[in-house]
Amino acid sequence: MKHLHRFFSSDASGGIILIIAAILAMMMANSGATSGWYHDFLETPVQLRVGSLEINKNMLLWINDALMAVFFLLVGLEVKRELMQGSLASLRQAAFPVIAAIGGMIVPALLYLAFNYADPITREGWAIPAATDIAFALGVLALLGSRVPLALKIFLMALAIIDDLGAIIIIALFYTNDLSMASLGVAAVAIAVLAVLNLCGVRRTGVYILVGVVLWTAVLKSGVHATLAGVIVGFFIPLKEKHGRSTAKRLEHVLHPWVAYLILPLFAFANAGVSLQGVTLDGLTSILPLGIIAGLLIGKPLGISLFCWLALRLKLAHLPEGTTYQQIMAVGILCGIGFTMSIFIASLAFGSVDPELINWAKLGILVGSISSAVIGYSWLRVRLRPSV
C-alpha cells in the first residue's frame, strides 16, 4: 500500500497511466482476439433525453465531447489562475504563448502543403498538422514529474489551448458545412449568464456547472467542438479569495485526480487504437502521411521556435520565468503530438471524399505524434535537472 500511495502521489503517475492506456488500446485494436470487442465498446450507443432535447452518440464521442469538456474546464481554471496571479500575469508574458501558437499553426500547414499542394484532394488536409493534442502533450510532460517548472507547464497549456481554439476556428470556417445559428445564440446567452454570475460575485460552483451544461449542449448542437465550453466555464468561475477560500482553486483541487486518473486514461484508451492492418512502406512514404509527419515533427517545433525567437528579438514578449529557450524548443516538439484533434480534422477533410485517405492520414498522425513525444520527452529529460 505504501508503494501504491507513493505512486499516486507522484507528479508523473498520471502520465504513466495515460501512456499505459494508449499502449493497451493499440494492442487491443491490432489483436484479432480483442479488436472486435474494442471497437464494439467505442461504438456502443448512449442516448440522453431531457424532454424534447435528445443527444444520441456513441461511447467514443461521449468520451471526446463530454468527458474531455471536464478536462478543458480544469485547463481553463489553471490558465486563468496563471493569467491573473502567476507566470502569465503581464501582457508580455501572456503574449508569448499566443505568438508561439500562431507559429505552431502556420508553419506545419505550409510544410504539409509543400508535399500536397499539387494534389487537389490531399491538399484539403492542410490543417491536420496544425493541431496539438493538449491531453497527450501534458501527459508526456507529466512523466518528468516535479522537475518541470510550473511556468513551462502553463506555457504548454496556454499554447495548446490557443492552438485548439485556432483549430476550432479552422474547422468552423473550412470544414463545417452547417452551423446552427440558433444553438450559437443559446451558447451566447449562456456565456452572458456566466459573465453576470461572475460580476455579481456568485460563488456556488453548482450554478456555474449548471449553466456550463447548457453551454456545452448548445455548443455541441451548433456544430462547433463542444470541449470549448469547458474552457469558457473555467474562465468565468471566480478566482478571488473570500474568507480565505477560492471557488476556482477549490474546484481545481477536486477535479485534478478525476482528470489525471480517469478522464485522460479513458480518453487515451478510446483514441489510441489505430489499426496498422494493411500498412506498407510505400504507403507510409506517400505524400499524404509524409506531409503530416513533416508538419508535426518538423513544422510544429520549427514554427513555435522561430516565432518565439522573433518575439524575444523584437521584445514583444518575455520567456516564462524559470525557463530557457532550449526548454521552449523542447515543448515545441511536444506540440507535434497532434493525435485526436488531427485525426478529427482528417475525418472532416477526407470522410466524404475517400475514407481510405483517413487511414493513411491516421498513420501519418501516429508516426508524427509518437516521434514528437519520444524526442520531446528525451530532450526535456536532458534539459531539466531533477529538483533537489
Swiss-Prot record:
Residues 1-11, 81-96, 131-154, 201-204, 237-253, 311-339, 381-388 are cytoplasmic. GO terms for molecular function: sodium:proton antiporter activity. Residues 32-58, 117-122, 177-180, 223, 273-286, 351-357 are periplasmic. Keywords: Antiport, Cell inner membrane, Cell membrane, Ion transport, Membrane, Sodium, Sodium transport, Transmembrane, Transmembrane helix, Transport. One of its GO terms (cellular component) is plasma membrane. The chain crosses the membrane at residues 12-31, 59-80, 97-116, 123-130, 155-176, 181-200, 205-222, 224-236, 254-272, 287-310, 340-350, 358-380. It is a multi-pass membrane protein. GO terms for biological process: regulation of pH. It catalyses: Na(+)(in) + 2 H(+)(out) = Na(+)(out) + 2 H(+)(in). It is found in: Cell inner membrane. Belongs to the NhaA Na(+)/H(+) (TC 2.A.33) antiporter family. Na(+)/H(+) antiporter that extrudes sodium in exchange for external protons. This is Na(+)/H(+) antiporter NhaA. It comes from Shigella dysenteriae serotype 1 (strain Sd197). The gene is nhaA.
